[in-house]
Amino acid sequence: MENYTVQPAKSVRGEISVPGDKSISHRSIMFGSISSGVTKVTGFLRGEDALATLQAFRAMGVQIDDDGETVTIQGRGLHGLSEPTDVLDCGNSGTSMRLLTGLLAGQNFFSVLSGDKYLRARPMKRVVGPLALMGARISGRAGGEKAPLAIQGSKLIGIEYDSPVSSAQVKSAIMLAGLYAGGETVVREPHLSRDHSERMLRAFGAHVETFPGGVKVRGGAELTGRDIVVPGDISSAAFFLVAALIVPGSDLLIRGVGVNPTRTGIIDVLKGMGGDLELTNQRDESGEPVADIRVRHSKLTAMEICGEVVPRAIDEFPAICVAASLAQGTTVVRDAAELRVKETDRISAMADNLRRAGVNIVETPDGMQITGVASLKGCAADSFGDHRIAMSMMVAGLVAQGETSVSDVECIATSFPGFVNLLDGVVQR
């Protein structure tokens, strides 16, 4: 397992672009594969998670070519996938597994989904349960709670489902099954989760309607291939936003970041803490809002983070924890129990690591209380095999007194293979 040592930084300065959005990259492969005609994707994220989705569709007979600039998908149509001859390996990707479970439930063949030890430990009943109500035949370990999942494609019927969690993965899995189901499928959720599936499926020609609190899909519509430009991933930009806010003397411009309003919780939170962030050059690309973000070092103040902003910032909480650890006062996070079932328990992991760095943190079942300190201590941090924990603690190391080492950093390749080089390029020492 590879460790990485971080030295304190004098400032974070320059202009960068972050890799393509992971959520949109996954969906571009999935939706392009079940469309008729050609889909061309630029800005595709070549991280391990999105590549797992790409390889899964190749294993189901889809021709996908990648010349390093553009990913070209020769769509097979809604019913054109072939039965895979082997287990579909989702690696560490919960998005791959959960969305594929919905998509495969309505096929006319058998398939098996598995992944690495971390993915095999994550809860799948939240997807398997509602799909079973649609007529899906899915079995797995622990009564369908854990992967591997065996899926015998079957005839599906539309349902109305009130999701107990605000999860784009749950919503999207049900929507994808709804493409193959008779009648209408309706999903409601407590707070709006990211809406990339709704936007993109509509662009491909699916019958998708949104309404306050939910989405409706009518089955049977044929999808048509299209060109997609993937914006920069705001979840990847988050580490640089926090780095520039907490390192004195910093001034950083991040170009071409996706600022879909269902994903900009990180911006709302950091601004709420007093962060100097400015969105410029706002435009629309492939149905997604995009902007450049300028961020400067700021004195941060604690705040309460709860309610509807939580699902809009769910993947950015490890980075938010680092910002909160240096904010004046006590930051209270509530309504974020979903963090406990990510690649690792992110509440426990960040609490453990930041305590090592000298921060006073109290865990709660659905969040934490973080009392900021004047400075962090260098420490030996543990990534727990989670890419976002690893990158967050590397950012924390930029302002720590002394050296910070982070264990098992190869997990970063799941979402951001070039992170270390990009960070080194803007850190002044």
UniProtKB/Swiss-Prot annotation:
3-phosphoshikimate binds at K22, S23, R27, S167, Q169, D315, K342. Its EC number is 2.5.1.19. It catalyses: 3-phosphoshikimate + phosphoenolpyruvate = 5-O-(1-carboxyvinyl)-3-phosphoshikimate + phosphate. PROSITE patterns: EPSP_SYNTHASE_1, EPSP_SYNTHASE_2. Belongs to the EPSP synthase family. Monomer. This is 3-phosphoshikimate 1-carboxyvinyltransferase. It comes from Geobacter sp. (strain M21). The gene is aroA.
